């Protein structure tokens, strides 16, 4: 199949546009008494008494004993802080990446407070499953995050979540195989060792196309009418590169944990992932583990920068909850500076709080450096317009067709 035709078929599959839904804004004026939102001392004993059961959803790792039961401990600390509130917490498991799909199916039956990846935001808004925040909560968010992070949880000037980390992927590599100059070029790395990349994962494959000037919903990722532009000569050239990449004896498609297991046993020398794999890799590789922003790749003699999708993970509030003042305060508490510090200590979740990022210990962390350099230098803000939902499956299937040798 011709590469231009193949790229056009992928584009056609991703171009069905969906419509914007209405946003829930019932908490736009909701004030919160969380200590993180106010610089002055708060008298929690002045709060009206509340007895309530609050449902909180988050990833399994944040509730696991091996990671210190971060979520439970932070909720218990919140309960102790609010002396007039008698709160019982019920926990459920839902990863940030699954929040949109899961919660939008039954908003009224879902958690009061939950964690979500910002690419899920428009889905949650369309389903009436996430509340617009306001008041001192938004003041705190804007005072403690970069503009890019704030933008990642903002739609039509409305803020919908309390960010707690940047969300992107970068490169892990074996320092015993690659030097600092080697890791600048993907093609150089392929000459010297085995490289694993999740080409059948739609969150990753776009990095090559964006690197060659292809766009998703315009330059800012917000123009639905512009659609996805992966067709034409630019898209065809990238597709040809990827077909050749799959044919390289040193390339391994990363699926079902192949990259992590290979890095740990030494059969793979570089992979692309995020902070969620850091602990396992660090324990297995020790000082040989290197972390870096994305490399370039050579397309027809030109070095092009790979660019990942980037965004944030945040704490959201369900507008259907019975006790919005509790839910908003808890969301802010789970995303405040102290909670981000404990998250970092427990699971190496890189903070986005600007005060924490200024601390010397965190600034020296190789993981933090790589994640922030990738976010700032080798990524684009992942579009979260409704039509982006039509990208994921066609992109995944297109990657599979390349890996399976259906394009040649």
Tell me what each language-model feature is.
Residues 36-44, 116-170, 181, 290-294, ...:
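Hinge/lid segment of periplasmic solute-binding proteins
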Residues 5-8, 21-120:
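Conserved N-terminal structural module of periplasmic/extracytoplasmic solute-binding proteins
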Residues 283-346:
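Extracytoplasmic/periplasmic substrate-recognition and gating elements
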Residues 103-104, 109-112, 139-173, 194-198, ...:
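A structural signal for short loop-to-beta-strand junctions that line the ligand-binding cleft
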Residues 81-144, 160-161, 269-270, 280, ...:
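Extracytoplasmic "Venus flytrap"/periplasmic binding protein-like
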Residues 309, 347-351, 368-408:
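C-terminal capping/gating helix-and-loop segments adjacent to ligand/active sites or protein-protein/ligand interfaces
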């Amino acid at each position: 199949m011709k590469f231009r035709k193949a790229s056009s078929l992928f584009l056609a599959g991703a171009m069905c546009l969906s419509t914007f839904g209405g946003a829930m804004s019932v908490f736009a004026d909701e004030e919160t008494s969380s200590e993180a939102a106010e610089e002055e001392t708060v008298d929690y004993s002045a709060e009206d008494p509340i007895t309530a059961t609050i449902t909180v959803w988050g990833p399994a790792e944040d509730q696991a004993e091996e990671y210190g039961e971060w979520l439970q401990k932070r909720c218990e600390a919140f309960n102790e802080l609010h002396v007039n509130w008698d709160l019982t917490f019920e926990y459920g498991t839902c990863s940030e990446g699954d929040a949109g799909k899961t919660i939008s199916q039954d908003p009224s039956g879902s958690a009061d407070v939950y964690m979500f990846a910002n690419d899920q935001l428009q889905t949650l808004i369309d389903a009436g499953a996430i509340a617009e925040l306001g008041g001192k909560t938004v003041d705190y968010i804007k005072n403690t995050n970069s503009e890019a992070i704030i933008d990642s949880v903002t739609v039509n000037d409305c803020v919908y979540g309390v960010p707690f980390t940047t969300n992107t992927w970068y490169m892990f590599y074996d320092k015993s195989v690659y030097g600092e100059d080697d890791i600048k070029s993907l093609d150089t790395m392929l000459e010297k060792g085995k490289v694993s990349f999740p080409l059948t994962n739609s969150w990753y494959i776009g990095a090559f196309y964006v690197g060659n000037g292809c766009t998703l919903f315009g330059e800012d990722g917000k123009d639905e009418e512009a659609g996805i532009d992966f067709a034409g000569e630019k898209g065809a050239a990238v597709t040809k590169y990827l077909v050749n990449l799959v044919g390289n004896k040193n390339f391994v498609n990363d699926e079902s944990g192949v990259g992590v297991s290979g890095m740990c046993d030494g059969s793979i020398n570089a992979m692309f992932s995020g902070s969620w794999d850091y602990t396992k890799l660090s324990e297995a590789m020790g000082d040989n583990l290197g972390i870096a922003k994305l490399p370039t790749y050579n397309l027809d003699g030109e070095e092009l920068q790979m660019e990942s999708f980037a965004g944030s993970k945040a704490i959201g509030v369900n507008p259907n909850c019975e006790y919005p003042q509790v839910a908003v305060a808890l969301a802010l508490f789970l995303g405040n500076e102290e909670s981000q510090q404990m998250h970092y200590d427990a699971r190496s979740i890189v903070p986005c709080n600007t005060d924490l990022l200024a601390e010397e210990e965190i600034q020296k962390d190789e993981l933090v450096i790589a994640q922030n350099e990738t976010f700032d230098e080798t990524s684009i803000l992942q579009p979260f317009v409704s039509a982006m939902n039509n990208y994921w499956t066609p992109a995944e299937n297109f990657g599979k067709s390349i890996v399976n040798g259906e394009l040649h």
